[in-house]
């Protein structure tokens, strides 16, 4: 597994959390 792949997964989860918080 490449570090970029791990960052991509974490980025999706992190961005998703931020989007949810921004919506609220």
From Swiss-Prot:
Swiss-Prot/TrEMBL induction comment: Expressed in both exponential and stationary phase in rich medium; expression is considerably higher during exponential phase (at protein level).
Highest taxon above the source species: Bacteria
Name of protein: Protein YsdE
Organism: Escherichia coli (strain K12)
